[in-house]
């Protein structure tokens, strides 16, 4: 698994709307890396990227 590059999104007010799905180590498909980072910070989790694309 690959840790998401959350640092590059930390200054943004929200996530970009581009659809570039990643599969998290929790088995969920996220629309993009930023959404995974946002979910991690909101829910105090440490989900990583299992693979690019849908799960």
From Swiss-Prot:
Molecular functions (GO terms): serine-type endopeptidase inhibitor activity
Alphabetic keyword roster: Disulfide bond, Protease inhibitor, Secreted, Serine protease inhibitor
GO CC term, one of those recorded: extracellular space
Pfam families attached to this UniProt entry: Kazal_1 (PF00050)
Annotated localization: Secreted
Disulfide bonds: 6-37, 15-34, 23-55
Domain Kazal-like: 1-55
Marked site positions, Reactive bond: 17-18
InterPro entries with a match to the protein in the record: Kazal_dom (IPR002350), Kazal_dom_sf (IPR036058), Prot_inh_Kazal-m (IPR001239)
Biological role stated in the UniProt entry: Inhibits trypsin and plasmin.
Name of the featured protein: Trypsin inhibitor ClTI-1
Source organism of the structure: Gallus gallus
């Amino acid at each position: 698994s690959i840790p998401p590059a959350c640092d590059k999104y930390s200054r943004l007010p929200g996530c970009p709307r581009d659809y570039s799905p990643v599969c998290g180590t929790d088995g969920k498909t996220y629309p993009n890396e930023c959404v995974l980072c946002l979910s991690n910070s909101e829910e105090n989790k440490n989900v990583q990227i299992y693979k690019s694309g849908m799960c």
